[in-house]
Every structure is written in structure tokens, then in C-alpha cells.
A protein has these predicted regions:
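Feature captures the FAD/FMN-dependent oxidoreductase FAD-binding
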Residues: 70-145, 150-155, 266-277, 289-292
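N-terminal Rossmann-like FAD-binding beta1-loop-alpha1 element of flavoenzymes
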Residues: 3-30, 195-198, 202-212
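Glycine-rich active-site loop/strand segments that organize a redox cofactor
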Residues: 34-84, 179-181, 219-238, 351, ...
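A conserved FAD-binding loop/helix module that cradles the flavin
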Residues: 341-393
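Conserved Rossmann-like nucleotide-cofactor binding loop
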Residues: 13, 36, 153, 201, ...
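E1/E1-like adenylate-forming module used to activate ubiquitin-like modifiers
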Residues: 149, 153, 295-358
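Glycine-rich dinucleotide-binding loop and its adjacent helix/turn
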Residues: 77, 148-212, 217, 317-327, ...
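A Rossmann-like FAD-binding core segment of flavoenzymes
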Residues: 106, 211-314, 381-394
Length: 394
């Protein structure tokens, strides 16, 4: 049986990896848990990116879709999905290669446990076994090389101190919004919204919710003196605008927005059709009764997929160790200045297994699509002379 390259996830990086495999003549299959490509992008489709079209389209996509928009205009998530990624998925080179509604539940080396054959050729040549959840039930697939491009957006962080769930959070999980709210549905957010987080997603939500006349925002920020991720002489106007707006809200520019800095969630409890939230603040305990809770405290990838593989994770970021070391050692936190870490940093102790895209950055929030496309370039270059491996597993 001819084995394939397994690509997990049909987002921008997974689709670019598929094009790279098609260009190289390597057999491949893309496994996508949703019923469409770019499911994560569509989940925040109403939000406009900071980065322009030219930073969000790979050279492989551009070569096959020359009419894709160019220039400094910044697309929304929905525009990126419908004007770029849907046409990519419809290309003849990808026909029949994407298996929708098929989630990879776990990955292992066929016949080997995690601790066996460490660093040996035996382990390197054993195929991967993928456990699949499909519309028809569980199934098994094999591959010689696996690219995990599953992203992070479906695995949000929790609200409690130190990153664990706050008491009551799990019981109220179905009443907590963990994605960017769409404020075009203004009635949906009437009343008091408790917003938690200080990153760009939370800043976007604060800006948009503050514009709704029927909404009051109680914004909880962990740091006592947040810098809002300001970048000196920022060249991305949309990002700078968010910083300016957040500073203004923290300074009291909108009387329907209260910003609680140096605060964190202690507990949540139901209060009839509302939620009571206990806060720890610099001034002492504080309670808020709210109609909605929006938790935007970041996202991390699902590491359980490769629990049985030999993956060396950074103890601080959760990213692959070599990637994390390269990024943490670079100067500055601007996504536009992050280095291309190189193929050696992308490799794992598990041969032929790569974590690419936003998931490769772990808890670091400086990933750009451009970086993911560079990762695909590095992967292709490293395997350019290995067609026999990819087609026969030897």
C-alpha cells in the first residue's frame, strides 16, 4: 500500500502544505475536522486582520490563483476564507485530497510505544498510525510523514488564577463565550458583559462592545499596568489603533466601560439568568453581576494528539523546544520581526513529525501566516531529495 503525507488541518498553513506536496509530486491527504476549510478563520470572520493581503497569501497560492487580491488592504477573516482559501481548496491539485468531518484523534508509531527505539532507524522508518473520527465511525490511516497544522483557536485557555479553571467555570462552560463576539448582533450583547483578557482579541472585543449603546463592559485585565502590546513606530495601523483605543478606555473615555487592572477571576456562580463573578483586585475583593462572560485569554494547541510521540516541548510556552528557544532568544515581541527559525528548529525528536503554523508557537502570540508559509518552504527544501521515503516509507 502506498502511504501518504498526512496534513492535519485545512486552514491556511495546511492548505499551503497541500499545495507544496502537490507541487513536489508527493501523495498526501488533508484531514479536516470541520465540514469546510478555514473553520477557525470563519469563527472570527467579522474581524479584520492587521496584516495586508500581501502578507497573507503564499507564493504557491499566488502562482495558482493570480487574481487573488494584492496590496495593503487588510481582509477580514471571512474574506480571507472565501476569496483565498475556498478557491485554493477547489483547485484540481487538491481534488479528492481533503477529508472533511474527519478529526485525527491520536497519532502513534505503528508497533512502537513512546519510549521505544529512541533515535534509531527502526523508529524513523516505522509508519505513523492515525486514529480518525469520521462520519462513519472510527478508522485507522497510515502515513510516513505528518504535518500538524491544526492551529489553536479551538482550544481556549481558562479563566482562573495561574491558568486553571476558576471555581464554577466548568459548570458554566456553556454560558461563557470564548471567541470574538460579533457585535453586529447588538441585541445579543445587551446588558453587562464581563470581558477577560488583554491581548488583541480582548482589545478588539472591548472596542466593539464599547460601541453598543445597550451594553456595559466590565473589563478584567491581569496586569496592573498593561502596555497593551504597543510596538514603537508601529507600521500596522490597525494594531496601533487598538492600542490607542485600549489606553483611552482604561483612562475612562467611555462611561459604559470599566477597566479593572491588576485583577483576576476567583470564582463564578449562577445567579438566576445572570452570572456572579468574584474578582480579586488590588483594592480587595470585588463582585460583579453580569449577563454575559467573554473569555479571551488566549489559545493553545492540542498536545494530546501526539502524546505517544517523542515531542520535546518547551516547559514555558508549550511549543516545540527548539522553536521556542529560537523565538524567546530573538529581540522584541513584534510579529513582523520574528526570525525564520529554520528546519532544524522545526524538527522534533520524533522523525518526520512536524508541528507547523500557529500551533508551533505555543503560547507565544507573535505568529504570522507569512511565518507559516516560510515553514512550509523549509520543510519542502529539507525533503526535496527524499521522494523514496515519502512513497515507500524506506
Amino acid at each position: 500500500m502506498q502511504r501518504h503525507v498526512a496534513i492535519l488541518g485545512a486552514g491556511p498553513i495546511g492548505l499551503d502544505a497541500a499545495l507544496a506536496c502537490a507541487d513536489a509530486g508527493w501523495p498526501f491527504t488533508v484531514y479536516e475536522a470541520a465540514d469546510t476549510v478555514a473553520a477557525h478563520l470563519r469563527a472570527w470572520g467579522h474581524v479584520r486582520l492587521f496584516t495586508p493581503w500581501d502578507l497573507n497569501v503564499s507564493h504557491r497560492m499566488r502562482a495558482r490563483l493570480p487574481d487573488t487580491p494584492t496590496g495593503d488592504g487588510c481582509p477580514t477573516g471571512a474574506e480571507l476564507a472565501t476569496r483565498l482559501l475556498d478557491p485554493v481548496a477547489a483547485l484540481p491539485a487538491l481534488e479528492g485530497r481533503i477529508r472533511y468531518r474527519t478529526r485525527v484523534a491520536a497519532i502513534a508509531r505503528t508497533g512502537l510505544l513512546k519510549h521505544e527505539q529512541i533515535g534509531t532507524g527502526t523508529r524513523a522508518t516505522a509508519p505513523f498510525t492515525l486514529l480518525l473520527d469520521t462520519p462513519d465511525g472510527e478508522a485507522i490511516a497510515e502515513a510516513d510523514l505528518v504535518l500538524d497544522c491544526t492551529g489553536t483557536y479551538s482550544h481556549p485557555n481558562t479563566l482562573g488564577p495561574g491558568g486553571i479553571p476558576a471555581p464554577g467555570e466548568r459548570a458554566l462552560a456553556d454560558r461563557i463565550t470564548r471567541t470574538l463576539p460579533n457585535t453586529e448582533e447588538s441585541d445579543r450583547w445587551a446588558g453587562t458583559v464581563l470581558l477577560v483578557g488583554a491581548g488583541k482579541s480582548a482589545q478588539t472585543a472591548a472596542r466593539d462592545l464599547a460601541g453598543l449603546p445597550g451594553t456595559r463592559v466590565e473589563w478584567v485585565v491581569r496586569k496592573p499596568a498593561p502596555d497593551w502590546g504597543a510596538v514603537p513606530d508601529d507600521t500596522l495601523p490597525g494594531r496601533q489603533h487598538l492600542v490607542d483605543t485600549s489606553r483611552a478606555l482604561a483612562d475612562g473615555a467611555n462611561d459604559r466601560v470599566a477597566v479593572h487592572t491588576g485583577a483576576y477571576i476567583q470564582a463564578l456562580s449562577p445567579e438566576s439568568d445572570r452570572i456572579r463573578v468574584a474578582l480579586a483586585t488590588e483594592g480587595g475583593p470585588h463582585e460583579i453581576s453580569c449577563d454575559h462572560v467573554v473569555a479571551l485569554t488566549g489559545y493553545t494547541g492540542d498536545a494530546s494528539l501526539y502524546r505517544q510521540l517523542q515531542v520535546h516541548e518547551c516547559y514555558a510556552t508549550g511549543a516545540p523546544m527548539n522553536v521556542s528557544a529560537a523565538l524567546l532568544g530573538s529581540a522584541g515581541g513584534d510579529c513582523l520581526t520574528q526570525p525564520a527559525v529554520g528546519i532544524d528548529a522545526l524538527r522534533n525528536p520524533e522523525p518526520h513529525f512536524f508541528i507547523l503554523g500557529a500551533k508551533s508557537y505555543g503560547r507565544l502570540n507573535t505568529f504570522l501566516l507569512r511565518t507559516g508559509y516560510q515553514q512550509i518552504d523549509q520543510f519542502v527544501a529539507a525533503y526535496a531529495d527524499a521522494p523514496r521515503l515519502l512513497s515507500t516509507g524506506t
